Amino acid sequence: MHKFGFLKKSSELNVMCIGAHSDDIEIGCGGTILKLIDEIRKVQFNWIVFSGDETRKKEAEKSKDAFLPKNKVKKFDIKNFRESYFQYTGDSLKDYFEELKTLSPDLIFTHYRNDAHQDHRLISDLTWNTFRDNFILEYEIPKYDGDLGVPNLFVHLDESIVQKKINYILDIFKTQKEKKWFTEDTFRSILRIRGVESNSPSRYAEAFHCRKIVL
């Protein structure tokens, strides 16, 4: 598979990571985040989570500290929108997105437009409605709904990054342990499948839906 790299070590990159819930960013693009930190010297992250009770907020902050060195954090914010009820607070959500717009990110990670979870879909829609001239990648979250699509952009991940991502997720998000799908084999399997699809030399990859790109 042909590769096209548009980022260099000397690049300056302002990244925004958007998640409806406190583990979404890590599951969807945690490996890519770790790879960007390794490969891009001047990368900064805006880490935005839209919901979480006090326990989940503590998990989100601990996770942010694990994934991001302090000097790479431009903005970190956890909102308190009610989980699964985002659609009923659309005006407040939209107002907050207008605030985020002023951060002018170069690259945005957000939810998949066709995600079966209603909170995820709304966050994806508002991302596209707000950021009309930015590079947006939609990540995927495995779940009971069976809504994984056919992604078209892949980031190859070394085994060390794969293991680090999985360890962080399982060690930090203790509140999710009762979910049967929240296991190492789930997270590793989806990375392995995407690695097969993109002929990854390391066997693993994260995958994204890229709807618009200008070369």
Task: Label each PLM-derived region with a short phrase.
Residues 112-119, 157, 161, 179:
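Short, well-structured alpha-helical patches and their helix-loop capping segments
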Residues 143-144, 213:
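Short polar/acidic secondary-structure junctions
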Residues 63-68, 156, 168-175, 190:
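Helix-loop "lid/cap" segments that line or gate small-molecule binding pockets
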Residues 182, 199-203:
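Alpha-helix N-cap and coil->helix boundary residues
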Residues 145-160:
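Phosphate-binding/catalytic loops
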Residues 160-186:
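A charged, well-structured terminal subsegment
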Residues 1-143, 149, 186, 190-199, ...:
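Active-site beta-strand->loop->alpha-helix modules in alpha/beta enzyme cores, enriched
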